[in-house]
A protein has these predicted regions:
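Structural signal for interior beta-strand "rungs" in well-ordered beta-sheet cores
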Residues: 37-153
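Terminal amphipathic alpha-helical/low-complexity segments used for targeting or macromolecular assembly
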Residues: 1-54, 60, 105
Length: 153
């Protein structure tokens, strides 16, 4: 069986991968210089993401879109946050958050799926295997585990 990928194509692909990795490292180094603690080379942060000093970003975390992470947050490991605001002191552990606003000092996860238009107030806990969509959670609300809450206030 012949190799159907030319040497020139492989060289071009390697060049693109090297450029992408250099851009990723530049973004990580900018955040580290601003006081963000980044725990791993497996972290991916999009250019438009804002992270306050003192936040901790753990291994396997992906931050995309217009995401804002507050001071003192712990994000990860293995967390995806896209187009969302995470206020100060919030922990998001091994979860996914899309188009939502997590208030201060929340505890999210593990394995929680926060879908669009979820808004949490101070001190909310969304436990293991919780899924939310288009819902508001008042100060101190707790959802322990294995729960779906959607289209509610």
């Amino acid at each position: 069986m012949e190799n159907c990928v030319s040497s020139a194509a492989l060289d071009a692909a390697r060049t693109r991968l090297d450029a992408a990795e250099a851009a990723r490292e530049t973004i990580l180094l900018q955040h580290i210089a601003n006081g963000v603690i980044i725990d791993s080379r497996t972290v991916q942060i999009a250019p438009d993401v804002q992270i306050a000093p003192g936040a901790v970003i753990l291994a396997g975390t992906i931050l995309r879109g217009h995401t804002i992470i507050g001071a003192g947050c712990i994000i990860g490991p293995n967390t995806l946050i896209e187009d969302s605001i995470v206020d100060e002191g919030t922990t998001v552990n091994a979860s996914q958050v899309y188009g939502s606003h997590l208030g201060p000092h929340n505890n999210i996860g593990p394995f929680t799926h926060v879908r669009v238009n979820t808004v949490t107030d101070y001190g909310v806990h969304l436990g293991a295997y919780v899924e939310t969509k288009n819902s508001n959670f008042a100060r101190g609300n707790t959802v322990s585990h294995l729960t779906y809450i959607g289209d509610s206030d």
